[in-house]
C-alpha cells in the first residue's frame, strides 16, 4: 500500500473511534497537547473532520472498526484502534508501537447458560458461531484443530442463540452484564483487548522524525494520565 496524503498534504491526520473508547482516549489526546475545535463536542454536529489547537494536525472521528482501515490505506497517519480490530484485519501497513491502556475488555466465546454446565470446550470439533470477528475466531479454533463456521453479524450478537441462528457467539465482553441479561455465559476467553496507537508504516518511513516524535508524545501522555 502506498501512502496517499490527499488534500492537506502536510497536515497530520489522527483517526479516533466514536463511542466509549473516544471518551477514554480524549485525556490522552489532551495530554499530548491537542484540543479539537468546539464542534467536536457538539452532539448535534455531523462534522467528521476537525481542526485542532495545533494547525498542523486534524482529527477525524470514525467507527471503531474503521480506524485501522483509514490508517492502513493512508487516509490518516495515526489512529487509536483496539488490538481486536488490528488482529481481525491484519493489515501489513499497520504499525502498533504503543499500548494505550484504555478500552480494556476481552473477546470471548459465550453460549446459553443452560448448556454451559455440561459443555466442554476441549471436546469441540466443529462449532457454529455468530461474531463480528470471523478471522480471529477461525484462526483461534484452527490452532486447536476445531472447524469454526462463522456467521458474520455487526451487532445484536446476543440474540443469535435465542433465535436459533447458532448455539454460540464470539463477542467483546466488559462487565458481562449484557450476556447475563440475555441468558448467556462466557465459556472461553480468546483475547484480552486494549486500544493501541497505530501508525501507517509508509508514513513512518517518509515522515520518520515527525511520526517518532508523536509516538513519544503519546507515550509521555500515557505516563502522565496514569500518574
From Swiss-Prot:
GO MF terms held by the record: ATP binding; ATP phosphoribosyltransferase activity
Reported function: Catalyzes the condensation of ATP and 5-phosphoribose 1-diphosphate to form N'-(5'-phosphoribosyl)-ATP (PR-ATP). Has a crucial role in the pathway because the rate of histidine biosynthesis seems to be controlled primarily by regulation of HisG enzymatic activity.
Protein name: ATP phosphoribosyltransferase
Main enzyme class: transferase
Main location: cytoplasm
Any one GO BP annotation for this protein: L-histidine biosynthetic process
HAMAP family named in the record: HisG_Short
E.C. number: 2.4.2.17
Species this protein is from: Rhodospirillum rubrum (strain ATCC 11170 / ATH 1.1.1 / DSM 467 / LMG 4362 / NCIMB 8255 / S1)
CDD domains assigned to the protein according to its UniProt record, in alphabetical order: PBP2_HisGs (cd13595)
Amino acid at each position: 500500500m502506498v501512502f496517499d496524503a490527499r488534500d492537506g498534504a502536510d497536515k497530520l491526520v489522527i483517526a479516533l473511534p466514536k463511542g466509549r473508547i473516544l471518551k477514554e482516549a480524549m485525556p490522552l489526546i489532551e495530554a499530548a497537547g491537542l484540543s479539537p475545535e468546539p464542534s467536536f463536542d457538539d452532539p448535534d454536529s455531523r462534522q467528521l473532520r476537525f481542526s485542532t489547537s495545533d494547525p498542523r494536525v486534524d482529527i477525524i472521528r470514525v467507527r471503531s472498526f474503521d480506524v485501522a482501515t483509514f490508517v492502513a490505506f493512508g487516509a490518516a497517519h495515526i489512529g487509536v484502534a483496539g488490538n481486536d480490530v488490528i488482529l481481525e484485519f491484519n493489515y501489513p501497513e499497520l504499525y502498533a508501537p504503543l499500548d494505550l491502556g484504555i478500552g480494556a475488555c476481552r473477546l470471548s466465546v459465550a453460549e446459553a447458560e443452560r448448556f454451559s454446565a455440561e459443555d466442554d470446550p476441549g471436546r469441540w470439533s466443529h462449532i457454529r458461531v455468530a461474531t463480528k470477528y470471523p478471522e480471529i475466531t477461525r484462526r483461534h479454533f484452527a490452532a486447536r484443530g476445531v472447524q469454526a463456521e462463522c456467521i458474520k453479524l455487526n451487532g445484536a450478537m446476543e440474540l443469535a442463540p435465542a433465535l436459533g441462528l447458532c448455539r454460540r457467539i464470539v463477542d467483546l465482553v466488559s462487565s458481562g452484564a449484557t450476556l447475563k441479561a440475555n441468558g448467556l455465559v462466557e465459556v472461553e476467553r480468546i483475547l484480552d483487548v486494549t486500544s493501541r496507537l497505530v501508525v501507517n508504516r509508509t508514513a513512518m518511513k517518509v515522515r520518520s522524525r515527525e511520526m517518532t516524535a508523536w509516538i513519544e508524545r503519546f507515550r509521555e501522555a500515557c505516563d502522565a494520565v496514569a500518574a
